[in-house]
Amino acid sequence: NYMVITGLLQQGYRKLAYEIARNHYDNVLKVYKNTGTFWEYYAPEHEEPGFMARPNFVGWGGLAPISGLIEQIFGIRSNVYEKKLTVDVNLTEAYGIDRYPFGLDGLVGIKVKARSSATQEPQVEITSDVPLELTVLWGDKQKTANVKPGTQTV
């Protein structure tokens, strides 16, 4: 799933990538709630561990609850070499992440405020100790800002 989702994002299919990631994440969460643990891998078409998967094992199966949550569901993706950070906002609920590593020296805090609808322009509060370019995406719209060290709302 991770490889397919990444390929879809690279080809501009953000909505489909989000839907697949969200479905996979939700299924992993259901399995966790039912069994109390994470598994080595998961069944591709059912809400259950994969055939002969080991419990209490976070290998490739850890991509959904960690990377999938941050990169696809929260939409936080970085390109440190170009000093760019993207927040692709799909949720209407408030969410955020503190101490997101940005390269060797940077830490970034991101807080996305709640919205009344998916079409409403998101407000993103960003705290960074390094300069970067922030792009906020929602639907077919986007806004970009140059972020200086400190806190600002975009």
Task: List PLM regions with ranges.
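C-terminal capping/lid segments that line or modulate ligand- or cofactor-binding pockets
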Residues: 1-103, 109, 113-117
